[in-house]
Swiss-Prot record:
Residues 35-296 form the CoA carboxyltransferase C-terminal domain. Pathway: Lipid metabolism; malonyl-CoA biosynthesis; malonyl-CoA from acetyl-CoA: step 1/1. This is Acetyl-coenzyme A carboxylase carboxyl transferase subunit alpha. Component of the acetyl coenzyme A carboxylase (ACC) complex. First, biotin carboxylase catalyzes the carboxylation of biotin on its carrier protein (BCCP) and then the CO(2) group is transferred by the carboxyltransferase to acetyl-CoA to form malonyl-CoA. It comes from the Bacteria. Its EC number is 2.1.3.15.
């Protein structure tokens, strides 16, 4: 799988290109008098060291780029790597089935759960089919239908957040985009089952919040959560999207910053270089966090669960 190196990773890309070149030469002619294995190993160690150095001092804008990485794991990738017996459920029973939201029943270590998440696409056709991960009102109404089903059957709800934002098209507005988001916020705040939310990529404004009200809210290390994109903020404040790096720093969109502000509960570490480098490793870390969160919530009765969730919402903004 291509790593699709970002701009700030170019020194790493150059080293990896040298490694690939030497490896290819070694495979083509095994009779070479020069032993390339030691040189390849040296370069690999240097690449790891350089990656560790670069990733130890990332800015908010660089993290935003990682959150949007084209090879980053999406909701369906985590479903495949963490859960078993997934059965997708479709449609909002009112208008259509929005492919930007996926959801269904699955098992987490044998325990039945309801999973709901944003889904982006990788190839052009899939991106269009998924509307680039931007749900329409019917997507949020589908999500709510599944949440209400989970409440009826006493299933914990697990959501995965990864969207640039709710779709802002005319049709979406005509079908009640803001109403759908607002209704989800209200209903999620009073569902009588545990809700664990995790930002796995972009957490874009109301489009993220519509499946983001929970008893536990986590973020992957290189994910972001914000009321507007850095480019959008820069365009408003500085009249230029070129100021996006400055806006990203000012907005405090990173997982560690939001943890400091008590907006989220946990930051889930990613493999060196980001989640796209090792799907299996990030799945193991995320699964462990989900199991720990559900264990914490299982000891609460319905009244305690709702009171705690209410207090959580009321405390937002107080550090």
């Amino acid at each position: 799988m291509s790593l699709n190196f970002l701009d700030f990773e170019q020194p790493i890309a150059e080293l990896e290109a040298k490694i690939d070149s030497l490896t290819a030469v070694s495979r083509q002619d095994e009779k070479l008098d020069i032993n390339l294995d030691e040189e390849v190993q040296r370069l690999r160690e240097k690449s790891v060291e350089l990656t560790r150095k670069i990733f130890s001092d990332l800015g908010a804008w660089q993290i935003a780029q990682l959150a949007r990485h084209p090879r980053r794991p999406y909701t369906l990738d985590y479903i495949a790597n963490i859960f078993t017996d997934f059965e997708e459920l479709a449609g909002d029973r009112a208008y259509a089935d929005d492919k930007a939201i996926v959801g269904g029943i699955a098992r987490l270590d044998g325990r039945p759960v309801m999973i709901i998440g944003h889904q982006k696409g990788r190839e052009t056709k899939e991106k269009i089919r998924r509307n680039f991960g931007m749900p329409a009102p019917e997507g949020y109404r589908k999500a709510l239908r599944l949440m209400e089903m989970a409440e009826r059957f006493k299933l914990p709800i697990i959501t995965f957040i990864d969207t640039p934002g709710a779709y802002p098209g005319v049709g979406a507005e005509e079908r009640g985009q803001s109403e759908a988001i607002a209704r989800n916020l209200r209903e999620m705040s009073r569902l009588n089952v545990p809700i664990v939310c995790t930002v796995i990529g972009e957490g874009g404004s109301g489009g993220a919040l519509a499946i983001g009200v929970g008893d536990k809210v986590n973020m992957l290390q290189y994910s972001t959560y914000s009321v507007i994109s850095p480019e959008g903020c820069a365009s408003i404040l500085w009249k230029s999207a070129d100021k996006a790096p400055l806006a990203a720093e000012a907005m405090g969109i990173t997982a560690h910053r939001l943890k400091e502000l008590k907006m989220i509960d946990s930051v889930i570490p990613e493999p060196l270089g980001g989640a796209h480098r090792d799907y299996a490793a990030i799945a193991i870390s995320l699964k462990a966090q989900l199991l720990a969160d559900l264990n914490d919530l299982d000891v609460l009765n319905d009244e305690e669960l709702l009171n705690r969730r209410y207090q959580r919402l009321m405390n937002y903004g107080y550090c």
